[in-house]
């Protein structure tokens, strides 16, 4: 699979481990930064990753910040991105199978590296089920994006 991986400063070490695992398993994995522990802003890396997924440079993404929450909020602002923060394997599989999630968010300060690598492996290995009920629900979410995704007037 072709993946993009990005993090803020809190996730640099975990990002390196994730990239190493993905490459060793035969995936293509682009490192979208950061590569420093100097403080940076996670929305900048969420944007780079979201644009890579939306632009077709990656099929899916893995985005890492301290908690996983901020990165997830930022990524979900991009129309067509379905990001989920997962810190267990069941959620990582289920979010793809049922919700066709295309960005996995991890909290480097929440999850240990070994569990994180299992979560990433399960996320990458999962496929959208395509079940009618899930397609119907995703169509409703997509309609929300179309109706409510426009900027609010001042």
Language-model segments: which ranges?
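Helix-adjacent hinge/juxtasegments
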Residues: 48-86
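Structural motif
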Residues: 38-47
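A short beta-strand-loop structural module common to alpha/beta enzyme folds
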Residues: 28-39
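C-terminal binding/interaction regions
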Residues: 2-6, 10-13, 89-154
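Short amphipathic alpha-helical segments
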Residues: 16-19, 73-77, 117
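Short, structured coil segments at secondary-structure junctions
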Residues: 25, 78-79, 99
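Glycine-rich phosphate/diphosphate-binding loop of Rossmann-like nucleotide-binding domains
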Residues: 1-25, 29
């Amino acid at each position: 699979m072709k993946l993009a991986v990005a993090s803020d400063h809190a996730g640099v070490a975990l990002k390196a481990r994730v990239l190493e695992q993905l490459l060793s398993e035969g995936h293509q994995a682009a490192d979208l930064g950061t590569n420093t522990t100097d403080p940076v802003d996670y929305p900048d890396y969420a944007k780079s990753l979201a644009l890579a997924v939306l632009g077709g440079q990656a099929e899916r993404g893995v985005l890492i910040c301290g908690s996983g929450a901020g990165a997830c909020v930022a990524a979900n602002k991009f129309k067509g991105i379905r990001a989920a923060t997962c810190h267990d394997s069941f959620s990582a599989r289920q979010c793809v199978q049922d919700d066709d999630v295309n960005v996995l968010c991890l909290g480097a300060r929440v999850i240990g590296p070994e569990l994180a690598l299992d979560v990433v492996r399960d996320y990458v290995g999962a496929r959208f089920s395509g079940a009618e009920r899930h397609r119907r629900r995703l169509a409703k979410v997509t309609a929300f994006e179309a109706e409510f995704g426009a900027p609010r007037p001042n």
